[in-house]
């Protein structure tokens, strides 16, 4: 399967490295990039079962959907996963987590946040993320955000000066985010506005023109898209809170994407950005 996906007859040899790392008791973490019709279904089950043999030195594996950009000329015709298919993959992963946890004290196999959003399901409780070991692969980011936001809001409300602050806060802000997390961010904006009636929050979903509209995560929003799309709102907002923008240096081989840092965006929009 690996040889087929990478169009390289030697690609399967790389799996031997896992054996060597396991034999040397070297701690590992892995990721499965799931491609519809290629390595999902029975192939995904087999891959998960094969990787579980490297426990306990393989500490975690994330399962993420392949990102499908608009730059796919002459490439395999990948498709996006449907709501039902995302639910099936979540079920497949969660059905194995209990077994792993009982034997090793780790949930081991983790579905990325994107699966839960696509399937319209609630995110797992915090304990299931094993200390957010796969956070940088998009696993548990939303649960961590929910936890931190809720704790911070409750802390503010319990402050003796809250009632005075509630009356004094008069501000309009815009939160820019990717389309994937738009609904979730909107729900938290509503909670903030309930806590502070004088606070007006506009949540703006940035369309990804650079990579294509099928890329909806916040981490791949480029500066050029953010600047172009948010300018029309700047007359209504004094300050914009930018959730996350891409840094050109994070791309393979330092390929640029006309990105700007947060201060550069502020100069373009003629407003402060954080």
List each model region and its residues:
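Short secondary-structure boundary/capping segments
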Residues: 8-9, 47, 76-81, 85, ...
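A short, acidic, amphipathic alpha-helical segment used as a generic capping/interface helix at domain edges
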Residues: 214-266
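Short hydrophobic beta-strand segments
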Residues: 170-182, 235, 243, 250-253, ...
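Short, surface-exposed amphipathic charged segments that create phosphate/polyanion-binding patches used
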Residues: 74-79, 123-130, 214-224
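Conserved C-terminal portion of the radical SAM core fold
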Residues: 16-75, 84-114
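Hard-cation-handling environments
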Residues: 80, 87-177, 195
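Redox- and metal-dependent alpha/beta enzyme cores, enriched for Fe-S-associated oxidoreductases
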Residues: 158-234
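Hydrophobic, small-residue-rich alpha-helical packing segments that form membrane-like cores
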Residues: 1-11
């Amino acid at each position: 399967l690996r040889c087929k996906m990478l169009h390289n007859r030697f690609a399967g040899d790389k799996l031997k490295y896992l054996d060597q790392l396991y034999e040397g008791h070297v701690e590992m973490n892995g990721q499965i990039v799931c491609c519809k019709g290629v390595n999902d279904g029975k192939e995904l089950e087999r891959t998960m079962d094969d990787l579980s043999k490297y426990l306990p030195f393989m500490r975690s594996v994330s399962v993420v959907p392949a990102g499908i950009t608009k730059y796919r000329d002459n490439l395999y015709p990948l498709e996006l996963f449907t709501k039902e298919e995302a639910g099936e993959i979540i079920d497949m992963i969660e059905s194995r987590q209990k077994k792993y946890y009982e034997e090793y004290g780790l949930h081991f196999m983790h579905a990325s946040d994107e699966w839960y959003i696509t399937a319209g399901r609630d995110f797992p409780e915090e304990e299931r993320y094993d200390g957010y070991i796969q956070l940088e692969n998009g696993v548990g980011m939303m649960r961590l955000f929910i936890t931190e936001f809720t704790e911070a809001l409750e802390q503010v409300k319990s402050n003796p000066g809250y009632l005075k602050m509630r009356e004094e806060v008069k501000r309009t802000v815009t939160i820019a985010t990717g389309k994937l997390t738009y609904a979730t961010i909107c729900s938290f904006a509503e909670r903030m506005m309930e806590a502070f009636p004088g606070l007006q929050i506009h949540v703006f979903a940035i369309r990804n023109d650079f990579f294509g509209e099928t890329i909806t995560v916040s981490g791949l929003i480029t500066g050029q898209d953010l600047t172009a799309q948010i300018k029309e709102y700047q007359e209504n907002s004094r300050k914009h809170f930018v959730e996350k923008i891409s840094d050109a240096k994070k791309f393979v081989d330092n390929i640029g994407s006309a990105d700007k840092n947060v201060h550069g965006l502020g100069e373009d929009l003629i407003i402060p950005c954080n």
